[in-house]
A protein has these predicted regions:
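Polar low-complexity intrinsically disordered regions
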Residues: 1-5, 24-35, 120-128, 148, ...
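Active-site-proximal, substrate-binding regions of enzyme catalytic domains
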Residues: 3-130, 136-242
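Hydrophobic residues in beta-strands of the RecA-like P-loop NTPase core, especially within AAA+ ATPase
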Residues: 10, 429-430
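Conserved helicase motor core of SF1/SF2 NTP-dependent helicases
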Residues: 14-70, 136-137, 141-145, 150, ...
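Intrinsically disordered, low-complexity sequence elements enriched in Ser/Thr/Gly/Pro
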Residues: 56, 216, 371-375, 499
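Short mixed-charge
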Residues: 80-89, 342-403
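Small/flexible residues
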Residues: 220, 306, 377-379
């Protein structure tokens, strides 16, 4: 193999992290020289064959990689000593090399040993060797062995961009409130913009003088059906009861715009945000407004709010827990219940009264409403007494009022019971999606039915699934795959200054960086 000049050695995390990265145009070591061959320690095949039976992203990735190899594995079985190169479907040439059997197949040392061997062979020749990995640990080991690294660190799509709008173009926005796609290309040549991407304009001598979030736009279709950056349209609740629930930061304004947009305009919302940015709170508020809680709207978009509890994202079975399914899921539902209470409290403060009279249209002997009545109902207003009418549950003491609202509007379903479901006319909320495997993410998104909106949130910095990382998790997977799709809004937030839950959290986030 002395005539081969430039090599990329595959670390195992590169193979199972996402086989899509095996692309000639993407595989470039730090030396900026394009690789001629991708070298894989042959012992990795044993692990790929073992892992392909797993119900996990690792198993799925192993199957995809094996399938992409076509007849390569069959040929290797018949020619175990062959050093011929094989070509994958995407054109990348691959060679398998034996590494001493004393090294275990799953060891990170396999790639290091193969890299050192190839580097020694090239000592007197022109060429390069680099180890391809996304692991910080592998980068450190390669550096210690004086081997270059081809780092897998794909950019994470945030769905937002900040630009300085030239003064001569400022009137297009501040006066016309409209920048067409052609005008965008003229103002910002070479800067691409995706559908449903949010734009924060910085305009010298203008600022935010017009108030609100007038400096934020969204790239979508205008009233004439033409692609353009237009102002936010849905960022405020129409119901007076919800008028004090409003965005505090720019990223919340973007998230809220997507939440309140009609289902036929944005049926999928993905918000990847640092803790304390209002991911769950705003989703709960939008959901309660959407089912008609404390509003007088004659028609509402949703019949229910569907929640996949956070602990079930890790695939935890709840079957062993005592009680009915609602009893089993109640401990997982507490983050939602906390936010229901917070939303109710703001609604009370908005009304400015200690106690609301019951709606005249709701008779005293009416114990509730069934699902067929949900679209044309009025609801009793909450009593402004946080300690009144409480009920003790296995998860603690919950206000009966909050519990009644939870039972009336919310449905909790663990991940393991989601297969085959079709959820219509609902706001479907998936939290902690950073702990969801990619194959699970596809299954969950496919549960959407007519009239439903899916809201997916999570924080990649708080991974609990040991098999995932910040790029291979379900949250980033869905956000990346749906970027630039007109039916999806993808929003990312990593700025500590956009934390709103408590001022001290901003300082904590900065200290823990």
């Amino acid at each position: 193999m002395s005539h081969y000049h430039n090599y990329i050695v595959a670390a195992m995390d590169m193979l199972i992290g996402d086989p899509d990265v095996i692309d000639p145009d993407e595989i470039k070591p730090d030396t900026k020289k394009k690789a001629d061959f991708l070298c894989i320690p042959i012992q990795y095949l044993d692990k790929l064959g073992e892992w392909r039976h797993e119900l996990s992203s690792r198993g799925e990735a192993s199957k995809r990689l094996i399938n992409s190899m076509g007849g390569m594995l069959s040929y290797l079985n018949n020619h175990p000593n062959s050093e011929n190169a094989f070509t994958l479907a995407n054109g990348m040439k691959v060679v398998f090399r034996e590494v001493p059997h004393s090294i275990e197949a799953h060891s990170t040392q396999l790639a290091i040993s193969l890299g050192q061997e190839l580097k020694n062979k090239l000592a007197s020749k022109k060429g390069s060797v680099a180890i391809m990995t996304g692991s910080d640990w592998m980068v450190a080991k390669a550096s210690a062995a004086h081997i270059d690294v081809a780092r897998i660190n794909p950019d994470i799509y945030t769905g937002r961009t900040k630009v300085n709008l030239p003064l001569d173009a400022a009137q297009l926005w501040t006066k016309d409130h409209h920048i067409s796609e052609a005008e965008w290309k003229d103002i910002f040549p070479g800067k691409n913009i995706h559908f449903n991407e949010f734009v924060e304009f910085e305009i010298k001598n203008f600022g935010q003088a017009q108030g609100g979030y007038s400096n934020i736009g969204r790239f979508t279709y205008d009233n004439h059906g033409n692609p353009a950056v237009i102002p936010l349209k849905y960022v405020k609740f129409a119901s007076p009861s919800y008028r004090n629930i409003r965005p505090i930061t720019n990223v919340q304004a973007m998230y809220f715009e997507a939440l309140l947009a009609p289902v036929d305009e944005i049926p999928i919302v993905v918000f990847s945000g640092i803790f304390g940015t209002g991911k769950t709170f705003l989703a709960v508020a939008a959901g309660l407004n959407g089912v008609g809680y404390h509003t007088t709207k004659p028609d509402v978009p949703y019949d229910r709010i569907f929640i996949c509890p956070r602990d079930s994202a890790l695939g935890k079975d709840v079957g062993f827990l005592p009680g009915s399914l609602p009893d089993k899921t109640m401990p997982m539902a507490m983050p939602i219940i906390d936010n229901i209470y917070d939303v109710m409290k703001i609604i009370r403060d908005t009304a400015g009264t200690a106690k609301y009279p019951a709606d005249e249209e709701k008779s005293k002997d009416d114990s509730g409403y069934n699902s067929s009545k949900k679209r044309n109902r009025k609801h009793a207003k909450p009593q402004n007494n946080d300690n009144a009418m409480v009920k003790k549950t296995s998860s603690g003491t919950i206000s009966k009022e909050v519990l009644d609202i939870t039972n009336e509007y919310f449905e909790f379903q663990p991940l393991i019971y989601m297969g085959g479901r079709s959820i219509s006319n609902a706001l479907i909320y998936y939290d902690e999606f950073q702990d969801v495997e990619r194959f699970q993410a596809r299954e969950l998104v496919s549960r959407i039915g007519n009239g439903s909106k899916i809201v997916i949130t999570g924080d990649p910095s708080q991974l609990s699934n040991p098999h995932l990382n910040r790029t291979s998790n379900g949250l980033n997977y869905i956000g990346t795959k749906l970027a630039d799709k007109p039916y999806a809004a993808i929003i990312g937030c990593t700025d500590e200054d956009e934390i709103v839950r408590h001022w001290v959290l901003r300082e904590v986030a900065k200290a823990l960086k």
